[in-house]
Amino acid sequence: MSKYTFTQKNFKVFEVPGLEGRMSAIESEIQPKLAALGTYFTDFLNTHTPDEFYAHIAKHARRTVNPPKDTWVAFSTNKRGYKMLPHFQIGLYEDQVFVMFGVMHEAKNKNHYIEVFEKHFDEIENLPDDYRICTDHVKMEKPLIKDLSTDELKEALHRAHQLKKGEFFIARTLSPKAPELKTDKAFKSYLEDTFDHLLKFYS
């Protein structure tokens, strides 16, 4: 049994109807793996940065009717939460695993953090071909950076600056049958490599 890797059974959790049923499946099937990833990558980030990180598993506590379409573990330097700070996420939808770093619209000093991305604009454009951006964390769509023009990428950062609900993340995704999900070793190696790239934008 895999400790870290998401399996086909895990992805099928998002087919369970109803809030109560899906939350029960998330808690039993996915959250133990999110907890294991949380422990492993908290240690990883604490080793690779001068700061102390904490893992936050999504609780979906505000939901009263609609079941969640995704779930995740987030990493931030605040023990009580992550939305107000730049943070890392590992999570999954029905047909996507995502790893990302950036800021939500709730972030304090959001513009400062967006400016960090802008200062590293050339590095964003030169990331490996499978890196993406996410401008709305509740949507699965994450366009590949290589498919965006320089102007389109600058516009995404500009919108994150100017719009109250603006957000910006650098992301990487896997399909459920990706070879990186075949073993815990392969998945951890993929995630470590991704975090190494994302840490370029952590400041």
UniProtKB/Swiss-Prot annotation:
Alphabetized InterPro entries for the sequence: UPF0637, UPF0637_domain_sf
Pfam families: DUF1054
Domain of life: Bacteria
Family: Belongs to the UPF0637 family.
Cross-referenced HAMAP family: UPF0637
Protein's name in the database: UPF0637 protein Sca_0732
Organism: Staphylococcus carnosus (strain TM300)
Taxonomic placement: Bacteria, Bacillati, Bacillota, Bacilli, Bacillales
